[in-house]
Amino acid sequence: MKTSIVERPAQHWVGYRLQGPWQETVPQGFAQLKDWVARHALQGEWMAIYYGNPQVVPPQELSVETVLTVPADFALAVGEGIQHGTLAGGHYFHTCTEVQNNDFFSAWNAFFAQLQQRSDWQVDDRPCYEHYLSDGSQSGNWLLNMYIPVRPV
């Protein structure tokens, strides 16, 4: 797995925040977002922003934002039921990987193991996120960028 530290800009987004087990909320959030995006003919980067550590937080307390990036000046119509937010920029530990058979758990575990081998960077309190480069919703196979927020030790 090739990894690197990258500097990412802040990214503005529209999307849905859901709470509960990620294996349920992520597909649900993207289904909602896909319908909303189709009605508004928008284009952008598809991402999932994760809140909570699944090794210590009960599944029902985990949260995710399923989002599409938009320009900074994007104006969201009132009453649409969708949220507008900003993903913080800064340093991130990055990899581009292929997930097979929807096994995101193994991909994240391997990625975190790579970070733990480094002594010069540590995880900070911003959320981890995925940027999807392909749609694996039918095949279960995904190409994506994974990001862990970090700060120097």
Swiss-Prot record:
Keyword Iron: no
Sample GO molecular function, one term: DNA topoisomerase type II (double strand cut, ATP-hydrolyzing) inhibitor activity
Pfam families xref list: GyrI-like (PF06445)
Domain of life, source organism: Bacteria
Major subcellular site: cytoplasm
Subunit record text: Interacts with DNA gyrase.
Name this protein carries in UniProt: DNA gyrase inhibitor
Native species: Pantoea sp. (strain At-9b)
Lineage: Bacteria, Pseudomonadati, Pseudomonadota, Gammaproteobacteria, Enterobacterales
